[in-house]
Amino acid sequence: MRKTILAITAAIMFSANAMAQGDVYERSKIYEWPTDKQVVEKLHQWQDLKFGVLFHWGLYAVPGIVESWSICDEDWITRDTTMTYQQYKDWYWGQADKFNPTEFNPEQWASVMSDAGMKYMIFTTKHHDGFCMFDSKYTDFSIAHHAFKDNPRRDVLKYVNEAFRKKNFMIGTYFSKPDWHSQDYWWDVYPTKRGRNVNYDVKKWPWRWNAYKEFTYNQMNEILSRYGKVDILWMDGGWVCKENNQDIDMPHIAEMARRNQPGIIMVDRTIHGPYENYQTPERTIPETQLNYRWESCIPLTNDWGYVKHPTWKSPEKVINTLIEIVAKGGNLVLGVGPTPQGTIQPEAVERLNAIGKWLKKNGRAIYNTTTTKNYHSGNVWFTASKDHKHLYGIYMLTEGEKLPESITWQGNLPKKGAKIKILANGKSIKPTINGNNVTVKLPAGLPQQSVAFEI
């Protein structure tokens, strides 16, 4: 059995990783501006933060496979033929009795992310597999009722939120609208041949769907009423929607959410309308500036959660991604997957520290900035202070290349006689202006990474 499971795990890791690259959420094509003044104000505050973290942590961390998807009966998943689909699901559910993160240290998480320059945090309270990372009254399928049940920190969400609040983070909760463990979503009476979707006819069995709606409402009420101030409700599983005959009654959820948390930002991913207060392009950056609120969600590796042999993005890759996103008017939430023991991998800490060091010196061109009409010229990207008294340029150094002796851009001309200030060292440089072109000679000794300056 052990050999079979290992073989299955390897196969699923391969195919699911391929899926993770290809089948990603497309952002909505329509944006509806919120009218609630508290929501509008919260969105302004959130947009100023620019850089956040999204934690995926759950049962999938134990075998180190792509989050939840291996139990979904869709064509892109391949499994070892010696185990039936039901046997595999039973094995997967059984990881709950192995998930015992005795090294769980949310204070370490918060310190690492704060040092990385992140300003807000989103934590997976429940992914599509239905395993809750909080002590829910409505199911025993949670970390608080299995291998970790005797740990004083078994109500994981409580301690994650508290640790990040102490570091002055804006707090977000990820919640999956589909729950593949629930009998009211995947009913054992029927096979799961409808893939990720509810596996029975909602119109034929309305009482069961109503039970699922009530269950979902109650769990969202728990995470929004028992765990302190929450700023963002980040809802995943866009196929659970009215248009797909899976009406979860979002107006009812929204009324409860904003009663519990006035001004909360709601992110009903990919479902345009009043409950998608910002859009979430996944693993991608929009081609141009967008004139509404958005956030690219991109993992630090190729996977959202912990895997045993990750492919890491370099600090330079993340920094350059952040630069482009901010210049285009968005935020970046970076995916990090804690280990099954409850720690952040040293390789992640190393990269996050490097990102934080860059932001400590250059963050003035990132945080609390707004966009400029001329936001991009060659390798130079532009932002501005919110009062438009200061214009910033950032030369994006391509990975593997060395800083040039001088850089040139078009437009965004300095005022006559003004000098350009390098943010990393405070040195001022006199620019050369030729028509619409600006050239500056970079001082020696700069680190071989992207350079921010005030124009």
Write out the residue ranges for each language-model feature.
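Bacterial Sec-dependent N-terminal signal peptides
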Residues: 1-23
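Mature catalytic domains of secreted/periplasmic carbohydrate-active enzymes
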Residues: 21-455
